[in-house]
C-alpha cells in the first residue's frame, strides 16, 4: 500500500506532450507562482481519450519530457497514465489525491476550463481537485462549484501541432522546445514527413 506523502502543494499538468515545448514549461511556472506550489508533476497521457492518437509513441514523448524537465528540480515526470488505454483526468486526480492525502492542483488552460463540464465525471473532478487556470483566451464561464485559481499572465502562444508542422516542413524549432528536445526530435526523425 502506498503511504500518503507529507503535506505539499502539488500541481498536475497532464497532456499528450507531442512534443513538450516551452509553452508547457512556462504554463507550469505560472501555476507555481499563482498557487505557491512546491512542485509540478508532468503527467504524459499514453492514449488521449479526447484527441486523435499521439503522433509518436509514448516512450519518445516520455524521453523528451525527461530531457525538458531535467533543469528544473521542481518539475517531475510522473507516469501515472502509462497504461495502453484511455485514462481520464478524474482517474488521475483520484489516484494522486490518494497518494498526497489532499486535493492536487490541476493545471489547465482557459480553453479547457470552458469545456470542463463536458469532461468525464465532472462531479468527481470538481470535488477532488483545485484548478489553476492559465488564460489562453478570455474566460467567459464561471464554475462556482469548482475551486479555482486564475493566473494573471498569458502563457506563450505555441502549440505542439505548430512544432510538428515546422519539423515536417524542414523549418527550425529552435527556442520553441528545449535544445535537448530539438536534438532528440532530429536524431530520431520524429514528425518528419
UniProtKB/Swiss-Prot annotation:
Keywords from the UniProt entry: ATP-binding, NAD, Nucleotide-binding, Nucleotidyltransferase, Pyridine nucleotide biosynthesis, Transferase
EC number: 2.7.7.18
Reaction equations catalysed: nicotinate beta-D-ribonucleotide + ATP + H(+) = deamido-NAD(+) + diphosphate
Pathway listed: Cofactor biosynthesis; NAD(+) biosynthesis; deamido-NAD(+) from nicotinate D-ribonucleotide: step 1/1
GO BP field: NAD biosynthetic process
Gene3D superfamilies: HUPs
Keyword Magnesium: no
UniProt enzyme class: transferase
Domain of life: Bacteria
Disulfide bonds: none
GO molecular function: ATP binding; nicotinate-nucleotide adenylyltransferase activity
Similarity comment: family membership: Belongs to the NadD family.
Xref: PANTHER family: NICOTINATE-NUCLEOTIDE ADENYLYLTRANSFERASE-RELATED, PHOSPHOPANTETHEINE ADENYLYLTRANSFERASE
Job description of the protein: Catalyzes the reversible adenylation of nicotinate mononucleotide (NaMN) to nicotinic acid adenine dinucleotide (NaAD).
Protein name: Probable nicotinate-nucleotide adenylyltransferase
The organism of origin for this protein: Coprothermobacter proteolyticus (strain ATCC 35245 / DSM 5265 / OCM 4 / BT)
Amino acid at each position: 500500500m502506498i503511504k500518503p506523502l507529507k503535506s505539499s502543494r502539488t500541481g498536475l499538468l497532464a497532456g499528450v506532450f507531442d512534443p513538450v515545448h516551452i509553452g508547457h514549461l512556462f504554463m507550469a511556472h505560472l501555476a507555481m507562482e499563482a498557487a505557491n506550489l512546491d512542485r509540478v508533476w508532468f503527467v504524459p497521457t499514453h492514449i488521449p481519450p479526447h484527441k486523435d492518437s499521439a503522433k509518436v509513441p509514448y516512450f519518445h514523448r516520455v524521453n523528451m519530457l525527461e530531457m525538458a524537465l531535467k533543469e528544473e528540480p521542481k518539475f517531475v515526470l510522473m507516469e501515472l497514465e502509462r497504461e495502453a488505454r484511455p485514462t481520464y483526468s478524474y482517474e488521475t486526480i483520484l489516484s494522486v489525491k490518494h497518494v498526497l492525502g489532499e486535493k492536487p492542483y490541476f493545471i489547465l488552460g482557459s480553453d479547457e476550463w470552458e469545456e470542463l463540464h463536458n469532461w468525464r465525471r465532472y462531479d468527481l473532478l470538481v470535488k477532488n481537485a483545485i484548478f489553476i487556470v492559465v488564460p489562453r483566451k478570455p474566460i467567459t464561464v464561471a464554475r462556482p462549484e469548482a475551486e479555482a485559481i486564475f493566473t494573471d499572465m498569458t502563457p506563450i502562444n505555441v502549440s505542439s501541432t505548430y512544432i510538428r508542422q515546422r519539423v515536417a516542413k524542414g523549418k527550425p524549432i529552435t527556442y520553441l522546445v528545449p535544445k535537448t528536445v530539438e536534438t532528440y526530435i532530429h536524431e530520431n526523425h520524429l514528425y518528419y514527413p
